[in-house]
């Protein structure tokens, strides 16, 4: 019952955060960062508690594909939300929060119980898995930045004046962040 409640809370607040950002996406001042952070923080905390309660069970760890997907989604949501506090990432937020809502709701309907009695902890294996997961998340975020770059570039080439007066980041900033993320993801994947 706790897992169902946490899933509903996380999904609801992801949907609220998504709709808040989408409602003011092309407004000159953009969505209120304070409201977005509050809504997304509640969703992120509920998502984290959902992960803790669904992965760590009394009879072992449940590392099914659904739980690993939920973990990956959580890392991406936390990363993009943290980045959006410093850099404008308004186009990425609805996509990330929307997928977070869909994945948490889908986890209720997809059977996923693969219990491991114990995990053999070797430093090399844990390092490999952690670096690979982190690189995967960073490269997914870089992909989202690539989509954002394409969207802004397309609007600029059409000479859409609405984008000039919007709160969206300059194209060069998005390009620089994209290359930084690609380099970081590639380096982490190489070390993994």
Model regions: which residues?
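Membrane-interface helix-loop junction between the first two transmembrane segments
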Residues: 18-38
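Hydrophobic alpha-helical segments and helix pairs
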Residues: 84-134
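Hydrophobic transmembrane alpha-helical segments in integral membrane proteins
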Residues: 1-15, 131-139
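A mid-sequence, solvent-exposed acidic-amphipathic segment
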Residues: 155-192
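Transmembrane alpha-helix/helix-exit interface in multi-pass inner-membrane proteins
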Residues: 136-159, 188-192
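Cytoplasmic-side transmembrane-helix entry/capping segments in multi-pass membrane proteins
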Residues: 31-40, 66-68, 90-101
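Membrane-interface helix-loop-helix modules in multi-pass inner-membrane proteins
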Residues: 47-84, 88-96
